[in-house]
A protein has these predicted regions:
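Residues that form generic nucleotide/phosphate-binding pockets
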Residues: 59, 90, 154
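Short coil/turn segments at secondary-structure boundaries
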Residues: 41-51, 75-79
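His-Asp-centered metal-binding catalytic motifs of divalent-metal-dependent phosphohydrolases/nucleases
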Residues: 20-45, 56, 87-97, 117
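An active-site-proximal "capping" alpha-helix that borders the catalytic cofactor pocket
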Residues: 2-9, 51-66
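Divalent metal-dependent phosphate-bond-processing catalytic cores, especially two-metal-ion Mg2+/Mn2+ enzymes
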Residues: 4, 8-19, 29, 40, ...
Length: 173
């Protein structure tokens, strides 16, 4: 779904055919680290393992672990290495709270599109799921919850709520 969202947004923004294809590829590969994360730690939670984004970069651009069931490389997906750094950045930073300030404009555009595609997919997943599945609380507990002070402060400051600031089920809206 993320690859499709990246493709659609890139087309809507009038990107070149080559950049549309590259946006699609970045969206496809953004969660490549999830497979290795599940294999090594039996979890999809970064807090209980390591950043799945960093792990994705390791899987695609690094050495294949000796105990890995198969070798995967960025060359399996694209022959020309000219866009490797842009692809690496779009994968590495897609789950970061903020993008690094020093990114060039083109790399930032690709990072933004992958992050936005990922958010669209997360919202689709949430819309198709129950409160209990997503937040591990029943609907009554969710409806009885309120926004915490840190969440209200983040809203007033026009910024995202950090994970460690979320205390109440409502904070996850």
């Amino acid at each position: 779904h993320v690859a499709e969202a990246c493709d659609a947004v890139a087309r809507e923004q009038g990107w070149s055919p080559q950049d549309i294809d590259l946006a699609w590829l970045c969206g496809l590969l953004h969660d490549m680290g999830r497979f290795e994360q599940l294999r090594r730690w039996d979890t999809f939670k970064d807090a209980e393992s390591m950043s799945h984004a960093a792990l994705g970069v390791e899987v695609l651009f690094g050495e294949t672990p000796a105990d890995a069931p198969a070798a995967t490389s960025i060359r399996d997906f694209i022959d020309d290495p000219v866009e490797d750094e842009l692809i690496r950045a779009s994968i590495a930073y897609h789950s970061d709270f903020r993008l690094p300030a020093q990114l060039d404009e083109r790399t930032r555009r690709f990072c933004d599109i992958v992050r936005d595609g990922d958010k669209i997919d997360i919202m689709r997943t949430i819309a198709d799921s129950t409160v209990d599945t997503i937040l591990k609380v029943n609907e009554d507990a969710f409806l009885a919850s309120h926004f915490s002070a840190p969440t209200l402060a983040a809203f007033a400051e026009h910024r995202c709520v950090a994970r460690d600031e979320r205390d109440e089920p409502a904070d996850y809206l």
